[in-house]
Amino acid sequence: KNFDVDFIYHIIDFEKPIHSNKNLFNKPVYLVALIDHRKNINKIMSDIKEYIELNPMYLDKLLVCPKIYLNSFQPAGEWPTVPSLSAYYKAAKSYFPQVRIFSGMVTNFTELNRKRPDGDFDGINFSFTPIVHDASDYGVLDTPNSLEYIMNTVETFSNDTPVHIGPITLGMHFNPYGEKLADNLNKIRLEMAENDPRHDSLLSLSWSVAVFSQIISKNTEYVTFASMKGVHGIFTDDNQKRPLCYLYELLLYFKNSKIFKTKKIKSIFGLKFLMNEEIFYLLANSSTNQQVMTLDEKLLTRQSHLNESNFSKINDNNFSFFNFEDSGNDFSFEPYEIKLIKVK
């Protein structure tokens, strides 16, 4: 699928043999290199350079992260002996002077906060998943409330550089707190699992809107949500759209607009888009209760919606968030309902 994305988030484990995949890259690449901290830093950079030569790409951003930091270490506990992160960043800038060198962790904010970057860097990185402590629906939908604190904290040590958050998915990509991701053969709501049964659900879309609204900050410049295919994908293996695809198409449509987060009202998270002198609101009810809200603007509006009544047939009815109907200023939200509102 030819999605108009700005970059490809591409993670490679350099502790394993590297290989060629010349058909992979048609966009700027954000390469995340998981490396062996016991290896000579110059040899690490040579390995990365060799990989890029095997896989011709426009390398736009690079994060070099010791693979051992996929594990979580307690602040007062024993930490591994690893070269300073600044040594990796300095070497990366020397080998790749035209590339933006990112700092941070591949895993969650907890690990980033415990191992803050040092030295010079061009951006900062962490990911976000909701099923660390509580995989219940309530636990998942409560996690966006933590993001304002997280973003404010990151701002204190980001050196005022751009922030990349991602991947942002219900299921986990790595388990910093155990030997491996939890097996979830029965596809239940399970902490630390890679596959989450709600990935293709309306809850997943509503949660994604809530998360996106809360990571908006002056330095939030890059966001990676899902994969194209696979467990965290937005397409099936035969290229059919999965539900999250409709939301990501919408977010990509607004990528060049001015984006603001709206004040949370009850359980309704939202975003305001200003584009070509037009105003749009993307709002999501993150609760199991029906909610009612009124927009401040005393203007005529049009709306589209996605709730349980039309979600089950999302692929059958040529659904689009841009199929608007006239509406007023009072809006009723079903559980997990998402609305796109256009102010006329």
Predicted regions and their residues:
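Catalytic domains of carbohydrate-active enzymes, especially glycoside hydrolases
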Residues: 1-32, 51-59
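Carbohydrate-binding surface patches
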Residues: 265-297, 308
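Tight coil/turn sites that cap or link beta-strands
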Residues: 298-309, 333-338
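Hydrophobic faces of well-ordered beta-strands that scaffold small-molecule active sites
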Residues: 5-10, 27-33, 60-64, 101-105, ...
